[in-house]
A protein has these predicted regions:
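N-terminal small-residue-enriched
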Residues: 1-462
Length: 462
C-alpha cells in the first residue's frame, strides 16, 4: 500500500484523478470422475494492479503485476509517457469526452468469515471427500455412466486506493457440483445440482446430502419424452426464476448498453413492464451470496438496486463511466474479469423478491401445465427483448397435481414483457445460486448469482 500511495501522489501532481485497484485472488479446483481425480489452480486466480488516470479528455488505464517502493518513480514516468502517446492519437480519432470523477472521502475494511477455510484442510482430505461422493453415487445403479463431483473455491483479496479512498476487502466463495450421467439402450440423460455461496469446505457436506436426489432424477430422466410445443401455464423453480431474472432484466439493464443504444429498457424507465406482483433487485448488498462485496472494481461501494418495483421498471445498473456519461449515480456494478481487463456494467446478486403463496397452492391452481426445473443456459436480446432459456426438465401438472411424468429437454421462449406480465403467483421463499460464470456477449466472464422464488407464469415451451 505504501508503494501504491506514493505512485498516486506522484501522478496526482499532473492528473486530476488517479486510482489503483490491486487484486490477489487465489483458489483451487478439485474434481472426481469415474476415470480419475484432479487438483488444479482455480481459473479465477489473479494477482496484479490496474491504474486509472484522467488524462484531461477521458480515462487511461494501465495494468501491471509488479511494484516496489524503489521502482515507483520509474513506473510513474513510463505511465506519463504512455498517456502523452495516447493523447497524441486523439487528434486523429474520434473519442468520447468525460468529466472528472468526483469522489467522497472513504476508508473502509471488510473481512468475511466462513466455517471451514480450505487452507485449514489438506488437499488430500478435500479430494477424498469429493471422491467419496463420486463412488457413493456410481454404485446406486448400473445405468450410471459417470458421476462428476467438483469443488472450487477462491479467496478474494482486493484494495482500492485514490486520493480520497482507501478500501480493502477479503472474502471467500465456494461452489460445488454433483452431476450424474445415465444411459439405457435407447438414450443418455443427465442431471446435476449446484451449490454455492460465501462458504468454505462445509459446502461439500451439502453436496454429500444430495447424492440420492441427483441420481434418482437422472434415472427418471431416461423416461423423459419430448414436449408438445405450445403455450402453457408453468411454475418455475427458484433456479429457473433466477435464469429469467438474469437474462430478462439483468443484461437488459446494464447501462453501458444504454449508451450504445443496444438496450430497449432505456426507453421504458418508469413504465409498467411486468406484473404488479414483480419486484426485482440487484446489488452486492441485496443478498449475501457469490457477488457480495464491500466495493466494486472501480471503488464504488456495493449497493441494493431495485430494478423493477411492483411491475414498474425503475432503473438500470452501471459502472462509473456509463453513469458519468448518462448523468446518473453509479450503482456499484463496475466489474472486471481480471486486473488486465476493462470494467463493464455487470450484474451482482440478481433476483425476484418473494411473494406470499405456498408452492402447494401454486400447483393446485394449474389445470394443465408444468413445473420447470434445472436451468441449462439462457440468452436475451436486449435490443428487441426476445428471450430463450434452456431448461432440463418439465414435470407435468394435471388437475392441480404432479403426475410423475417428465419431459426433456425444454426450450422456453418469448417476449420479455409478455413473460413478466403473465406472472400471477409468487412463492414465499427465495433461493439464489451462483455457480459457473456470466459473460458479456461472448467474453468477459465474472462471478454473479441469481435466483428468486417459485413463480407461476404463462410461457411458450418447445
Amino acid at each position: 500500500k505504501k508503494s501504491i500511495k506514493k505512485l498516486i501522489e506522484i501522478l496526482s501532481t499532473e492528473y486530476k484523478y488517479v486510482s489503483v485497484l490491486g487484486t490477489d485472488c487465489f483458489g483451487k479446483e478439485y474434481t472426481s470422475l469415474r476415470t480419475g481425480t484432479s487438483i488444479k489452480n482455480s481459473n479465477w486466480n489473479e494477482r496484479g494492479f490496474v491504474l486509472k488516470v484522467y488524462n484531461g479528455i477521458n480515462y487511461s488505464e494501465f495494468s501491471f503485476d509488479y511494484i516496489s517502493y524503489d521502482s515507483v518513480e520509474n513506473l510513474a514516468e513510463q505511465i506519463k509517457e504512455k498517456i502523452k502517446t495516447y493523447i497524441s492519437l486523439f487528434n486523429e480519432n474520434e473519442v468520447n469526452h468525460y468529466p472528472v470523477l468526483e469522489e467522497e472521502e472513504i476508508a473502509k475494511f471488510f473481512k468475511d468469515k466462513v466455517d471451514v477455510y480450505p487452507t485449514t484442510v489438506s488437499d488430500k482430505e478435500i479430494l477424498n471427500k469429493i471422491t467419496n461422493i463420486n463412488k457413493n453415487a456410481i454404485v446406486l445403479s448400473d445405468k450410471i455412466l459417470d458421476v462428476r463431483a467438483a469443488y472450487n473455491y477462491l479467496h478474494v483479496n482486493k484494495i482500492f486506493m485514490s486520493n480520497k479512498k482507501d478500501l480493502e476487502q477479503s472474502y471467500l466463495w465456494s461452489e460445488g457440483i454433483v452431476q450424474c450421467i445415465t444411459t439405457n439402450e435407447e438414450d443418455t440423460r443427465f442431471n446435476y445440482k449446484v451449490f454455492s455461496g460465501l462458504k468454505g469446505v462445509e459446502i461439500i457436506d451439502e453436496m454429500e446430502s444430495s447424492i440420492k436426489e441427483v441420481v434418482d432424477t437422472a434415472l427418471k430422466a431416461l423416461e423423459a419424452k419430448p414436449i408438445i410445443p405450445g403455450m402453457y401455464d408453468v411454475i418455475c423453480s427458484p433456479e429457473v426464476s433466477g435464469l429469467i431474472a438474469h437474462e430478462a432484466f439483468g443484461h437488459g439493464v446494464e447501462m453501458d448498453m444504454f449508451l450504445k443504444e443496444r438496450a430497449k429498457a432505456k426507453e421504458y424507465i418508469g413504465q409498467h413492464i411486468a406484473s404488479p406482483l414483480v419486484t426485482m433487485r440487484d446489488g452486492a448488498t441485496s443478498e449475501r451470496h457469490m457477488s457480495s462485496y464491500l466495493f466494486d472494481d472501480e471503488g464504488v461501494l456495493g449497493q441494493d438496486t431495485v430494478i423493477i418495483d411492483k411491475g414498474v421498471l425503475k432503473c438500470g445498473i452501471s459502472d462509473t463511466l456509463s453513469a458519468l456519461k448518462l448523468g446518473e449515480k453509479p450503482t456499484g456494478n463496475g466489474k472486471r474479469e481480471s486486473f488486465e481487463r476493462k470494467a463493464y456494467s455487470r450484474m451482482t446478486n440478481t433476483f425476484f423478491e418473494k411473494g406470499y403463496c405456498k408452492l402447494e397452492e401454486m400447483i393446485k391452481s394449474i389445470d394443465y401445465g408444468f413445473l420447470l426445473d434445472v436451468p441449462m443456459s439462457g440468452m436475451e436480446d436486449p435490443k428487441s427483448w426476445g428471450i430463450q432459456c434452456m431448461v432440463n426438465f418439465a414435470y407435468e401438472i394435471k388437475d392441480g397435481k404432479l403426475t410423475g411424468k417428465i419431459f426433456s429437454p425444454i426450450v422456453l421462449t418469448g417476449y420479455v414483457p409478455d413473460l413478466l406480465k403473465s406472472i400471477s403467483m409468487i412463492s414465499d421463499e427465495i433461493c439464489l445460486e451462483g455457480s459457473g460464470a456470466c459473460g458479456k456477449g461472448y467474453k468477459e466472464y465474472v462471478k454473479v448469482s441469481s435466483g428468486g422464488p417459485y413463480i407461476k407464469a404463462r410461457v411458450r415451451l418447445g
